[in-house]
Amino acid sequence: LEGNLNHPADYDGVSCFNKFEFDRLLSNSGDFKEVLLKRVLKKGNNYLLPYRKIKNEFGDQFSDELFNDISKNDIYELPFDKNVELIADKWNDFTESALDDNKVYIFECCFIQNSLTIGMIKYGEQKEKIINYVMKVAKIIENLNPMLLYVEQDNLEFSFRKALKERTPEWSTGIVDYYTNQGYGKEHNHSGVEGAIKVLEARRNLELEIFDMLKMKKEKINNTKYEIDSY
């Protein structure tokens, strides 16, 4: 699920540093230097630090200042091309491992949604680059014989406004800001709830374009009536 800190094919709560950045972090980490050295994973020239796991383990001992300093390098805050590199590498590792497993893995949102969120919503990247990102991952996992389930709604605006009413005011404000104050939304001068809906509609259109391009087993699930048990 989204938010799983042990996700086998994605990163959540993990930051990435080069050697210079990591050495600088260590020099400013005080008593936590040894903790960071024990928890860091070096992959090539990248130093990967699962900072949310560290926070969960150490709680208030892990200062907010240090947490915030590390989280600035979260993999989903890095430049688009660096994110693609790291996420594709993670999918490669997962594929190599999963080929030897006799298991079925069910993942939420990490295949298409995350790619479009960082590429389109956050950075407003060219459509071709975003499509290539998804297709790159699709190529990596093709030997796993994946199946894509795409959940859709007939009325996107109704669904979004329903979510805004059901979620906290903080969530509602945050999601509208995220979709309108950066990337695609900012470039197209969208603002407020109406603007966020325009961005969501554009994202859906690109998702459906990618869905049609993918050469894998795939099904659309219409969730307009919110009848999960009927699936």
Question: Across the structure, where does each feature detected by a protein language model lie?
Answer:
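Phosphate-binding/switch loop-helix module in NTP-utilizing enzymes
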Residues: 68-102
